[in-house]
């Protein structure tokens, strides 16, 4: 192993090499670190979107509710497919989960075959931004409907339902939080790709 000290010709003692003289880390090592961070982020993205999807589609709740014109309470279900906004949200989560899985596999392939990195990185960066737009818009749309379910809107006669369907609303809130986290991960991936191109 090479010594990190230089012998002084006058005294014969060794002097340590200054830190500035140490060689910089190899580009191959930094490439591996970047690819590993990218893969970890994409695995987190897949986990977040898949969990949000599962929570959303299992949010159904049935409660005995007094309906207008009916003398006795009747069972009424609250389901995600009652709202077009929630349906759009679920479809966006399906697409995002599938994309996260495919992009993770592509990133692993690029780690094993780095010669294709430049070509596929451009595609991944573009698709990351497209998925960010889709998922963020779906999250915002579903969040608006969820807020009405929580607070209601007396001016137009929309009653709040979260006081009755508490499990349904909790599940939707959890799914929205996970989707927001996934959107932030996509934003990080987009910024990461942009910075990687400049360096």
From Swiss-Prot:
InterPro entries: CASP/CASPL (IPR006459), CASP_dom (IPR006702), CASPL (IPR044173). GO terms for cellular component: plasma membrane. The chain crosses the membrane at residues 37-57, 86-106, 130-150, 172-192. Keywords: Acetylation, Cell membrane, Membrane, Transmembrane, Transmembrane helix. Homodimer and heterodimers. The modification N-acetylalanine is found at residue 2. The lineage of its organism: Eukaryota, Viridiplantae, Streptophyta, Embryophyta, Tracheophyta. Coiled coil: none annotated. This is CASP-like protein 1D2. It comes from Arabidopsis thaliana (Mouse-ear cress). Its main location: membrane. Expressed in the root endodermis and flowers.
């Amino acid at each position: 192993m090479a010594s990190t000290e230089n012998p002084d010709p006058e005294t014969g003692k060794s002097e340590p090499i200054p830190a500035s003289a140490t060689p910089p880390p190899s580009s191959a090592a930094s490439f591996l670190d970047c690819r590993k961070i990218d893969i970890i982020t994409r695995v987190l993205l897949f986990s977040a979107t898949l969990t949000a999807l599962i929570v959303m589609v299992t949010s159904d709740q049935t409660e005995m509710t007094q309906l207008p014109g009916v003398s006795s309470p009747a069972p009424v279900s609250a389901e995600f497919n009652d709202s077009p906004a929630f349906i759009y949200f679920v479809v966006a989560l399906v697409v995002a989960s599938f994309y996260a899985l495919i992009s993770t596999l592509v990133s692993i392939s690029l780690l094993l075959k780095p010669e294709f990195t430049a070509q596929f990185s451009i595609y991944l960066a573009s698709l990351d931004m497209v998925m960010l737009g889709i998922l963020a818009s779906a999250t915002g749309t579903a969040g608006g409907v969820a807020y009405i379910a929580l607070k209601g809107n007396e001016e137009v006669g929309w009653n709040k339902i979260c006081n009755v369907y508490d499990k349904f609303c909790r599940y939707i809130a959890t799914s929205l939080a996970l989707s927001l986290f996934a959107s932030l991960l996509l934003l990080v991936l987009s910024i990461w790709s942009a910075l990687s191109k400049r360096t």
